[in-house]
Regions:
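TRNA-recognition modules of translation machinery and tRNA-sensing kinases, especially anticodon-binding
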Residues: 1-273
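N-terminal low-complexity segments that are often proline-rich with Ser/Thr-Pro
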Residues: 275-277
Length: 277
């Protein structure tokens, strides 16, 4: 065994120019968020494990496979944060930030997250994340559009020309209708699904749409579309958001199969992809 210590698998040392570039990127994004009236927030690198199970979802890959759980001598189980949102919501509630007269809350953050997944090119067990949370008891369309604009302007400030992918997940009624349709569709095909998706069929069938197994992907292509199960109220709300984005000249595409592996996504989901770098 070598006497020379090396960095843990799936981590990296940021040296010199790379560290400077990282700091510059964070500074640029912080500046854009500040221009939109957002404030910084810092939260612990670890939280009670049950926070992530409740906030992120028991059936998600993050909770089932990817959390770094900490050995400790106390009565509580702790995990390194696999993402920021659950911890930020905990901080908002614990510190009663929801009682602020200045709503919606606009918060930005950056730092390490930790996911125990297979390291590969461009994927680490300790990636770094920058993000924003715009939070209110009742988020209106203009606030949601503004949050998307922060992302768009931030990427443009970094020299990236993004296009936004959007999907309307609807409200409770729409998702309940769609969940039943997915169960009806996938149940006869259960034996053809991977082991994980067989569990997802029982816990959260929407997560099957995010499966990366090629054989499951073929089944997903023929699955019912969520847009066919949206009630009129959800359709009108989404249409209003698209009007706001159009008025701001935001480039976007609609993706009926776009879902994400976190259970706290409601109503709308969006990701950005570069059209050029």
């Amino acid at each position: 065994m070598s006497n020379i210590f090396t960095k843990p698998r799936g981590t990296q040392d940021m040296l010199y120019d790379k560290a400077r570039s990282y700091n510059k990127i964070v500074d640029i994004l912080n500046s854009v968020a500040t221009n939109y009236g957002a404030s910084p927030i810092q939260i612990p690198m670890y939280e009670e494990s049950r926070l992530f199970k409740r906030g992120v979802g028991n059936s998600t890959d993050i909770v089932m496979k990817e959390t770094f759980d900490l050995a400790n001598k106390g009565d509580h189980d702790y995990s390194l944060r696999p993402e920021f949102t659950a911890g930020i919501m905990r901080a908002i509630i614990e510190n009663k930030l929801y009682a602020s007269p200045d709503l919606p809350l606009k918060l930005y953050y950056s730092g390490s997250i930790f996911r125990y997944e297979r390291p590969q090119q461009g994927r680490y067990r300790e990636p770094h994340q920058w993000g924003i949370e715009f939070t209110d008891l009742n988020l209106d369309d203009s606030t949601v559009a503004e949050a998307i604009l922060v992302m768009v302007d931030g990427l443009k400030a970094l020299g990236i020309d993004p296009i936004i992918k959007l999907n309307n997940l609807g409200g409770d009624i729409s998702r309940s209708n769609y969940r039943k349709a997915l169960v009806d569709y996938f149940t006869p095909l259960k034996d053809k699904l991977c082991t994980d998706c067989q569990k997802r069929l029982e816990l959260n069938p929407l997560r099957i749409l995010d499966c990366k197994v090629p054989e499951d992907h073929e089944l997903v292509l023929k699955a019912p579309l969520l847009k066919d199960y949206l009630i009129d109220e959800d359709k009108k709300k989404f249409a209003k958001l698209l009007e706001l984005l159009d008025s701001c000249n935001v480039k976007y595409t609609l993706d009926d199969k776009l879902v994400r592996g976190l259970d706290y996504y409601l109503s709308l989901i969006h990701i950005s992809e570069p059209t050029r770098l």
